C-alpha cells in the first residue's frame, strides 16, 4: 500500500506539444524535426488542462514546448484558456524561427501576449544556429522586451562549441538590455546524445552539477505528443523508458503520477541524485570508476543507470542498506 506521506505534489504542467519542428538539431532531446508530425491536439491539451487544474491544485504554471510550439495554429487558444479560464501562468519555449524581422517578431509576440502569455523563453546555440540565425533571436528578444516581457535565452553550451552567451554581452544593443535586466541569458548544458561515450572519454570540465540531486523529478507533469506521461523533462528523458509513467489517455493522470512514489529509485534520484546512486552501485561493480563520471551531466549518469538492467539489479539487491536513511532525507526536503 502506498505511503501517501511520500507523495510530493507537482507545480508545473508541461506539454511537449509536438515533435514537429522547423529545425532538426542533431542532438535534440526529443529528436524533433520537420519530418515528425505527431502532435497533441487542441482537444487533448484542453482536456488535460481541465484534469490537472481539478486534480492538482498545486499546479500553477503551464509550459508549452516542443518541437516548436508556435507552429500550432491553436496555440493562442490554449494560452487563452489556460491563462484566463484556469488562472495558470503560461510560458512558451521557442527557437524564434518566426522572428525574421523585427516587425514579424513584434507581431508574433503581441499576438501571444494578447492571448495571455506570461513568459517567453528562447533556445539557441551551435546546433540551433544551423537553422535559425542569431539575428532572429535578437529580433525576438527586442520585440519581447518592447511588449513588456523579460525573455530568457538558453544557450546550448559545451567547451567545444563556438557560440556561447558572450555574444549577448558583445552586441551593443543587447548588452544594454542585459545590463538593465530586460532579459536573461544562461549557458545551458548540452549533451552529445548520439555519442555519449565520447563525452565520457573527454568530459566537459565546465560541468559541476553531477553530484546534485534531481529536482526535476516530482516537480511536474510532462505530457508528450504520443500521450505519454513522463516522470521528468530532463534532456535525456525521451530516451529512458524507465521514466515513462504510462498513457494518461487511458489511465487518470493522478493514478499514473502517484504510482511513481512506490519506486524507491525515483525517490533516491530526487534525494541524492544519480552520481550518489552510482557511487553506491560502484561498491558492487568494481569496473565503475567514479572519477570518470564527476564531470558528466547528471542526466547522462541517470540514463546510464536507468537503461541498465544490471545496474538496476544491483540497486534492487542492496537498496535495503540505504533505504531508511534515504527516506528520512527525502522527508526533510
Name the predicted role of every residue range:
Residues 239-333:
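Flexible mid-to-C-terminal extensions adjoining Fe-S/redox cofactors in radical SAM and related proteins
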